[in-house]
Amino acid sequence: EYARLAINASGCTPLTQEQWEDPSNGFNSAMSNNAWIWGLALPSESVANLFCFTAHMSTENAWSAYGNDACRCINSNLYNSIDLRDFRRHSWLDPDRKDPEKESYDYKSCRKEGKEYFNELPDYANIKFRPAQGAYEDFKVGGAADHPYMRVEEMYFIEAEAKAHENLGEGIRLLNEFMNNYRIVGGGYDCTNMSSSVENFTNELMLQKRIEFWGEGIVMFDMKRLDMSTRRGYVGTNSPASYRLNTEGRAPYWNFVISRGETQNNPVIATQNNPDPSQTVKPWNG
């Protein structure tokens, strides 16, 4: 009920493909779209080089090795689950983009040598978060990027999940409607066959929600709420060896722990702290 009220009262509409892939304003400008309900506006005078979201999450920026050298990548398993007709797939670099024998998407870039630059980056690198105004060389301008806290798309997912618990068919209809109206180019998405139960439907909805809000800090809370497992270790994984962590149910490291330095100075905190999750999940080694 309240998700639908938020959709109607906000007057917001989901991002279009053009807005999503905009090389100058993609996920960095509240004024360039009608999807953001709530966000953070960061003026240039508040930007301190590396101390901003863009420096770490924008692969196209030229001033921060955290972004353009470390390169935040999507899990290959998650990427491979994205429908080929889904334009959100263009948020990450396809492993086949350099193969002349295979058809590849013409990725948009704020860099003059965009295609050549993208070919140098690791497979699955994200290009979702662009430097503000496309200013990839100037951290004062490019780093002054707005950041979304809440997009109207989240309300559509909340509504579909809630409705499915009352009427599974209605939840399926709502997810199909969202995907075909706003994400799948040409339509044709149908989750009916993979939604024989509320649990199966929720798994599919969460898959689409993970794709939708990748890097925005939204889905971890859903996965904790639903006690969902993580899978980073598998044949063909692109996760670094020490990060190939598989869990049964919610990950213990999703609970924030106050650091040792603080507990040493304030012993009372140690009695009220969350358990230290260090080494509770061993990396998968094949």
Predicted stretch roles:
Residues 1-54, 79-286:
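Acidic/polar-rich alpha-helix caps and helix-coil junctions
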Residues 58-76:
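Short, cationic low-complexity segments
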